[in-house]
Amino acid sequence: MPRRVFALFALLVMFPIAAYAQAGTAATSVEPFKVGTFRMGGVTTVGAVLRDAFVVDLVQANAALQKTRAFPARPMPSDMIDLIGDYENGLKGRIYAIVNDLVTSKALEGKRPAYVRELKEVTTLAPIPRPRQIMMTAVNFYSHISENAPPDVRAKAVAARKANRGTPYLWLKATSSIIGTGETVVMPHGRTELDWEVELGTVIGRRARYVAAPKAEEHVFGYTVMIDISDRGGRPPGGFSSGSDWFIQKGQDTFGPMGPFIVPKEFYGNPMNVLKQTLVVGTDQRQAADSSDMIHSVWEVIEYASSLVTLQPGDIIGAGTSGGVGMGTSVRGSQLWLVPGDEITATIDKIGTLRHKVEAAPAPPAGTGSYLPPVATYRKPQQK
């Protein structure tokens, strides 16, 4: 080996970080990270979460490192949808480089740069505060099929679905329902049948239209935790009705907890192999499931969704929930609802935990003439 080539090889072996830093990008990250939206010092921005303990202000970190020759100028978005859209267009390598610089320089130990904060010192918001669209998958776990029916009826319904899975059933959840971890779930005034559903949220990373299931993962950015809060009290009697009113049931303010972070897909793995999700109210575990209970895979749901609409970066698809919801009787033998004062904890392994308290909303102002939110549960006789 010529002396000059040998010397260059030795430098690359001894100083691999310097090699990637020359371009201000990296092919791999020395540590996994999560991304989220945070309020730090009165400013809302995106950050990378390291070790579930530190938040790196990516905008400030990028600005600081660009002052060195190793990091050429490259914009860092402060909005999560912009970050997702640019992630595979070079931004991923820059974030990797920022993380690698912090880890290899041991900057997380002892005195840390100003752009690194402890997670407990910042306010964690919903990672995508206002998604462009949220699609949810109805009854996509076998344990959730007819779970409020008698056992024999439920068994027949499950067998029929296994014999003919059909296609996924998708519906749109109001983007205005989104809240971040720690925010309050508000029970509409007079309503008494509030329910819970923990779900995996798949965050789209690339435009997708007519995507086949085997290619679906290529269009995914990452994964998050969702709770589909549901008002099972029904709609006002009379007038037009086509059955369940999912706008009342699922679309009200605070009915869409999401977060606390998004885990990029390279750090999560295949959800059909690793998904484990639980939901606890107080100290009582109400739901627990893994992907083996799913009817349609995450990839099949993306295929179906992309056959109906064009998916864009930052769109979210809920994978459905398992048995154990409040309206069901298969797990506990009787129905059970959220009440003011309850604390909901929803966890998906490798992503994180959502924590929310439930509070009752005050009565609406007099003279509004509003039937929504209704002041009674319509599936039961009016209470005097």
Region locations from a protein language model:
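Positively charged n-region of N-terminal signal peptides that target proteins for export
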Residues: M1-R4
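Flexible glycine-rich active-site/ligand-binding loops centered on an Asp-His dyad
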Residues: A163-G166, L170-K173, A216-S242, D253, ...
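Catalytic-pocket segment enriched in acidic/His residues
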Residues: A23-V30, H144, R232-K384
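Bacterial N-terminal signal peptides
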Residues: A7-A18
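N-terminal non-catalytic cap/leader segment that marks the start of a structured domain
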Residues: Q22-N164, P168, E343, P365, ...
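A generic local secondary-structure boundary/capping motif
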Residues: G24-A26, G36, T123-A126, V158-R161, ...
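Non-heme Fe(II) oxygenase catalytic core, chiefly the N-lobe of the double-stranded beta-helix
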Residues: N140, K173-G234
